[in-house]
Each structure stands twice: as structure tokens, then as C-alpha cells.
Amino acid sequence: MLTNLHVKNLALIDEAEVEFGPGLNILTGETGAGKSILIGSINAALGKKISREMIRTGETSALVELVFETENPHVLELLKEMDLEAEEGQVIISRKITGSRSVCRINGEACNISQVKVLASLLLDIHGQHEHQTHDVRQGKTPGRIETVAHAGAAQQRAEIIADGLA
């Protein structure tokens, strides 16, 4: 479970600390409050590409640190394979981004992005708004059945098309 997020000098964030509790955690707020930056910082720490331009204006580096608590045997075994220890089930993943490179660490030990990505796949799932949808009506990208239903003239035809799709 992700218990803590620390972000420093990333985008508009000078420094931020977010504590997470057990169960579902939801970020809400006004437009422009920084929700996307927080999610982006988590993704960056977990190995996603991040532009150097995301470093806060006037700063030379940005830092994102995630703290996890886990008893997952797969995570603990993977850490052993990487010659890393998880004291009391705590895993700390950090990434420092500078103008020329980024450095990842797991529990204080330097590692590569691929190691972080493998570990991250066992620790966290992030689901954003509309990720479950398979179409984008605004851009005209819709599955064939939806287009067919939209253009069917009679209610009976629409019902048959839907029934066929469910069969």
C-alpha cells in the first residue's frame, strides 16, 4: 500500500507531502489544483518518462519519493533477488530528475528504471478518469456496434443489434 508521497520542485509544486490511508484513496479538487501533477509525479517515480521541463522554474532538480508498506511475498522475494532489503515491509522508491539525467533508488540503493517498473507492477495500480472506456466519441473513434446502433432507424433494429452484440 502506498502510504506517502513526497514531491519537491516538480512543475508548480515547491514541496508537497501526501499521506495515504488504507483502502481507496481519491484525489479531488478544483481545476488547476495540482491533481494531475501529483499523479504524474507518482508515475514518474514508478518509471514513466518525464520531461526535464517539468523541473520547477529556477530549480536544478526535482525529486519524487514514494513510501510503500507491503507484506506481499512476491514483492519481498523480488527485493531479495535485487539484493535489497525491505525493513519491516517498507519500500521507498525515489527518483531525482536533473537537466541531464535522472537517478532512481529503491530503499536508498541506486537502480535502473526497468527494476523500478517491475517492482511498481507489484505495488500499485493507478486508474484515471475514463481509462475503462474503449472509445472517444469526440474524436469519432467509436466501436462499430455503437455507430451501427446510432444509425439504426427503428427501435427493433437497435434492440436486435444490441442483443446480437451480447450473444
Predicted features along the sequence, with ranges:
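Gly/Lys-enriched N-terminal cap/neck module of very large, oligomeric protein machines
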Residues: 4-166
